[in-house]
């Protein structure tokens, strides 16, 4: 949950403002832009005493005067090396510091952080919100829950970008919350209910298909995964339609894997760290975070949000290794490993969305393979796709938002590895080689000629991450910022 209630942009003078904490930025070798004269040279004295030069990562804290109780100066580093992602990380440290001081509000001199620039302003707001994120919903003895009621950003800053950054970061925080909730609290039914609620609030059309409808609809691949939970935790296919663009414009489709708990099914996983399999719905969490963001910011583009939500459980009715199922597009699949279930869910959702909505492009998000961790570790999302132009759009947004990703090849030769002796294709490759690529090769069978990029977020969806605005533990809300940037670029 987010512990900042609101971020306000004010034109108040720093000298006249009453605040618990005033935050200033100083570039390496730079000055405080004459602000210190209004604070009786308090800051200059502290800076001199600490031999502070504005070096990146360094900071100085001192007491202020009657109106300004405390003043903190954060080093920005060299001007030419300051990036929007660096600003985002710095802002997250500022809100974390204010939280640790249990302040109800604090103020930031926008000019000293370069917040008249739109990208810096948006990144700063994102960092403030994400740096204050914590998840304490299930602590019976919660630590003193503290909320920063207000952050005031002062001066000539890009107010619209501040507002947009706050909304986007709240979308990321929502995706984090969904991932952090346990599987007994975020079921397919609850996820569907939340999607309906967001859609209704924004005037969007939502359609929820129950598992009882899957076979009649031809969703045989998805149904196979859901069999082990039928009658207990029923699967849902969630579709939300946002029409912000022209009526004649084809929609952009976002598809999420929503396996709310993955035991592996009959091909059951080892017990070690199986609790982490609540995170196997983080692809759908990204789609839900984007749904929330789009509902609030209302970009001028048509978007389809689609989620396949189910558990993957062993049961007397569960799918068996060796079963053959028929997907929505008519392809037959030999299921040789029930723990390679995410691709079976996505196969039907991708082909259904492609058939019913004829999207201009599709992106899918899934914690799909452990192999992507072997290839890229936890530092980057794996990207694979069938269209160079769309892939370049994704890469540009990856660079712009600091959400690192890396393209892996998807050559036709890899399709040979998923050919089956008894069906059209099988749901695993040949042995341990190129697991991420063969999984994407499987998905490619269900997108037709539609431009498509697959995000394998198994390495980036949860766990401790390096940037300061990422959580120390738990769900990261990966892909929300990147994809909203891409949608916005499409509009522009």
Regions found by a protein language model. Give the residues of each.
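A generic structural signal for tightly packed, nonpolar segments enriched in small/aliphatic residues
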Residues: 192-492
């Amino acid at each position: 949950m987010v512990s900042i209630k609101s971020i306000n942009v004010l034109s108040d003078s720093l000298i006249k403002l009453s605040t618990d904490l005033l935050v200033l930025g100083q570039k390496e070798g730079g000055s405080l832009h004459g602000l210190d004269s209004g604070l009786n040279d308090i800051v200059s004295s502290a800076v001199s005493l600490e031999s502070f030069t504005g070096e990146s990562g360094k900071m100085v804290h001192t007491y202020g005067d009657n109106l300004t109780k405390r003043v903190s100066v954060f080093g920005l580093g060299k001007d030419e090396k300051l990036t929007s992602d660096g600003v985002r990380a710095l802002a997250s440290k500022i809100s974390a510091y204010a939280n640790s001081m249990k302040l109800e509000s604090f103020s930031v001199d926008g000019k000293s952080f370069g917040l008249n620039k739109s990208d810096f302003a948006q990144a700063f707001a994102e960092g403030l919100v994400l740096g204050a994120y914590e998840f304490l919903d299930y602590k019976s003895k919660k630590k003193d829950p503290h909320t920063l009621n207000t952050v005031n950003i002062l001066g000539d800053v890009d107010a619209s970008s501040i507002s947009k950054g706050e909304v986007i970061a709240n979308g990321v925080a929502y995706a984090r919350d969904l991932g952090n909730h346990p599987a007994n609290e975020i079921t397919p039914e609850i996820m569907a209910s939340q999607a309906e609620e967001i859609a209704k609030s924004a005037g969007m059309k939502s359609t929820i298909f129950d598992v009882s409808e899957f076979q009649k609809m031809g969703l045989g691949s998805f149904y196979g995964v859901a069999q082990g939970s039928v009658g207990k935790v029923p699967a849902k296919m969630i579709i939300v339609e946002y029409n912000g663009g022209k009526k004649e414009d084809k929609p952009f489709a976002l598809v999420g894997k929503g396996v709310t708990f993955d035991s592996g099914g009959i091909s059951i996983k080892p017990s070690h760290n199986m609790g982490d399999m609540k995170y196997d719905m983080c692809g759908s969490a990204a789609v839900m975070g984007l749904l929330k963001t789009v509902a609030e910011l209302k970009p001028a583009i048509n978007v389809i949000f689609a989620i396949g939500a189910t558990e993957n459980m062993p049961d007397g009715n569960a799918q068996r290794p060796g079963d053959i199922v028929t997907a929505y597009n008519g392809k037959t699949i030999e299921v040789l490993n029930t723990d390679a279930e995410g691709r079976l869910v996505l196969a039907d959702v991708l082909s259904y969305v492609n058939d019913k909505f004829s999207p201009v492009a599709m992106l899918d998000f899934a914690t799909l393979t452990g192999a992507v961790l072997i290839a890229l570790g936890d530092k980057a999302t794996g990207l694979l796709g069938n269209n160079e132009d769309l892939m370049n759009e994704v890469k540009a947004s990856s660079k712009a938002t600091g959400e690192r990703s890396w393209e892996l090849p998807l050559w036709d030769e890899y399709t040979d590895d998923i050919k089956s002796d008894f069906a059209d294709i099988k749901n695993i490759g040949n042995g341990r080689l190129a697991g991420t690529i063969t999984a994407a090769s499987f998905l490619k069978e269900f997108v037709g000629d539609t431009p498509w990029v697959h995000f394998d977020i198994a390495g980036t969806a949860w766990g401790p991450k390096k940037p300061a605005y990422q959580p120390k533990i738990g769900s990261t809300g990966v892909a929300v910022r990147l994809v909203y940037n891409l949608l916005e670029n499409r509009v522009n």
